[in-house]
Curated annotation (Swiss-Prot):
Keywords: Early protein, Glycoprotein, Membrane, Repeat, Signal, Transmembrane, Transmembrane helix. B repeats lie at residues 147-270. Residues 27-117, 167-270 are extracellular. The chain crosses the membrane at residues 118-138, 146-166. It is found in: Membrane. It is a multi-pass membrane protein. Glycans are attached at residue 75. This is Protein MGF 110-1L. A repeats lie at residues 27-146. Residues 1-26 form the signal peptide.
Length: 270
């Protein structure tokens, strides 16, 4: 009974941390409170912009400089399930579909602060459980029982720490400021405002990854130095502008870029 109580105590922070996100039915306009999320990935979607007299201002990021209205701003529809989010670009035929992982879109600094908070709670829980074990030993003098429970407590504590700190280890793998040329199409689908996606000359910027992308005027939209991280099971890019902000997605995304998956498989074989 005592072991069950200790396990419950240690599990509460982890259970709270792994909450599910409410589903969202298909719509062309996300809830206002979610603009920051959708307009980070789908920042060329029309619902992110307020355009008047040819000048467009970003609804989600008020400090974003205005840009001229052009073909970069497209009509989109979105929907969400518990484990993934999808947005469709409907103003282009054939329609293009992109998938992102909803629970992992989170400000890196805030994410790390949350992990530190739960780590402290787990530590306090560990101390409390140790006190309970000590009291139990003093009362019943059952050293063997206390040792079994102590081992169980330590294992549970370490497993909880591994679960919480897993994502903080990402920076130790394959980090670079400029991705390989063969991967530009992949990275520039998500991090399209990263400066490695654009070739700017005389105030006009052309997209390096998508040759059919119309040129746009150089502006603050293209101002981020980005760092990319490529892991075996997921990729992330980090914006370096005032505050670090990390976004994570599966390396195989977007799913319609089959050439990227095939290229990676060929490299593994070689």
């Amino acid at each position: 009974m005592l072991g069950l109580q200790i396990f419950t105590l240690l599990s509460i922070p982890t259970l709270l941390y792994t909450y599910e996100i409410e589903p969202l039915e298909r719509t062309s306009t996300p809830p206002e409170k979610e603009f920051g999320y959708w307009c980070t990935y789908a920042n060329h979607c029309r619902f992110c912009w307020d355009c008047q007299d040819g000048i467009c201002r970003n609804k989600a990021f008020k400090n974003h400089s205005p840009i001229l209205e052009n073909d970069y701003i497209a009509n989109c529809s979105i929907y969400r399930r518990n484990d993934f989010c999808i947005y469709h670009i409907t103003s282009i035929k054939p329609h293009k579909t992109y998938r992102t992982e909803c629970p992992q879109h989170i400000n890196h600094e805030r994410h790390e602060a949350d992990i530190r908070k739960w780590q402290k709670l787990l530590t306090y829980g560990f101390y409390l459980a140790g006190c309970i074990l000590a009291v139990n030993y003093i009362r019943k003098r059952s050293l063997q029982t206390v040792m079994y429970l102590l081992v169980f407590l330590v294992i549970s504590f370490l497993l909880s720490q591994l679960m919480l700190y897993g994502e903080l280890e990402d920076k130790k793998h394959k980090i670079g400021s400029i991705p390989p040329k063969r991967e530009l199409e992949h990275w520039c689908t998500h991090g399209k405002y990263c400066n490695f996606c654009w070739d700017c000359q005389n105030g006009i910027c052309k997209n390096k990854a998508f040759k059919n992308h119309p040129p746009i005027g150089e502006n603050d939209f293209i101002r981020y130095d980005c760092w990319t991280t490529h892991l075996p099971n997921k990729c992330s890019y980090e914006k370096i502008y005032k505050h670090f902000d990390t976004h994570i997605m599966e390396c195989s995304q977007p799913t319609h870029f089959k050439w990227y998956d095939n290229l990676m498989k060929k490299q593994d074989i070689m």
